[in-house]
From Swiss-Prot:
Disordered: annotated segments: 264-384, 472-527
Classification via Pfam families: PE, PGRS
Residue ranges occupied by any PE domain in the UniProt entry: 1-93
Family: Belongs to the mycobacterial PE family. PGRS subfamily.
InterPro entries: PE-PGRS_N (IPR000084), PGRS_rpt (IPR048996)
Amino acid composition bias (Gly residues), ranges on this chain: 264-286, 292-384, 472-515
Coiled coil feature spans: none
Organism domain of life: Bacteria
Entry protein name: Uncharacterized PE-PGRS family protein PE_PGRS20
Gene name in the database record: PE_PGRS20
Amino acid sequence: MSYMIAVPDMLSSAAGDLASIGSSINASTRAAAAATTRLLPAAADEVSAHIAALFSGHGEGYQAIARQMAAFHDQFTLALTSSAGAYASAEATNVEQQVLGLINAPTQALLGRPLIGNGADGTAANPNGGAGGLLYGNGGNGFSQTTAGLTGGTGGSAGLIGNGGNGGAGGAGANGGAGGNGGWLYGSGGNGGAGGAGPAGAIGAPGVAGGAGGAGGSAGLFGNGGAGGAGGAGGQGGAGIGGADGTKGGDAGAGGAGGAGGWIHGHGGVGGDGGTGGQGGDGVQGEPGDTGAAGGAGGAGGRGGDGGSAGWLSGNGGDAGTGGGGGNAGNGGNGGSAGWLSGNGGTGGGGGTAGAGGQGGNGNSGIDPGNGGQGADTGNAGNGGHGGSAAKLFGDGGAGGAGGMGSTGGTGGGGGFGGGTGGNGGNGHAGGAGGSGGTAGLLGSGGSGGTGGDGGNGGLGAGSGAKGNGGNGGDGGKGGDAQLIGNGGNGGNGGKGGTGLMPGINGTGGAGGSRGQISGNPGTPGQ
């Protein structure tokens, strides 16, 4: 194999010489232009005129060729100059890598990580992200799985200064990876990876549960916590087989918790949202003389992740994630608490909306007609999360999350032709309760209570089937209390009852928070 050695300084010197030569040639060409392109005839006869024109044409041709050569010369000189710069840059890069290699070699040999540099991202073979340099560098990101059932890789942590790597997403039905921690002096935590969605169930089989979101990484002395990953959705349940009821949908994964903020200063990370529960499988038509099968229950929604707590000295608590919808909806996460000196509490997450009830199967038609199946009742709506507490000295409490809405009950199945009775509608469930507002610091106001969710409506009956009952409205959350100086938080309003054969009752409004001991106004109660 042959090798080429290039000396950047010599290339730069040669390019300068070429530029000087080109300038000299161009000056000579311009000086000769007047004497060679505009010749006067030696006499007034035609022969002299033709001779002058001939030599002037040769001069103009030379000038055209000279211009082309000058352009080529400029291009060649520019290419040589660029090559010299490229060789010099490559040489400098190699020197930098060699110096970093010498610096990192001792710690790499002793501790298995460099002194300076970013950690490697995870791969399918090694899904976890590598740690950043002990002195400086970010953690590598975790690998997002493409194979069902495999947990996402965790993000690598930083050393002294740097951000943690993000967690990888989980494969189908698997949890997301946690985010890496930020540098212990300065740096934010990495975000958690999302949970994988659960696959749908086959006929007669329930849906598969979704994976939970990964937790956000925590910061060190200064920095913000990473956000929690979202929970994966549950898979849809399979349809009933052989006259059986539809199967249950898969439960959703919970959202990951937000990471804690820096110990001296930093905000808590946001909690991840809970996943949506899988839809229940359909009920099938009944056999002759049998009642149609009921629809399957929806999977539970995932709980929203809690917001991360703030730094010990100052910082705001992280907002919580929202609960996922589903058969039984997920509750909202709680807001993160603020630091000791100053900061506001995080907002509580809203409760998830309950999944609608499945429709009942139709009765079989024929000589011995069957009755329609009853529509499925809805699940519970999620409660709102509580607001985070404020800092001990200065700060306001976080607002409570709103309760989830109740959903409509399932419609009854139609009776079989020839005398079958239609099924009754399913009952709507109660709305979720609102979360309580967070407590204030010595100087600050309490957080507002969350609003209660409205109750679900009763499902429609088929034919002569009765309509389902409405669900009650959720109660409003209590307002947060003030401490020394400040106003109490207002109570949340109660949700409205749902309509139905027996209408639901409206929820009760939450109590207002108490005023500060020295000054302030009490919170207004909810309606």
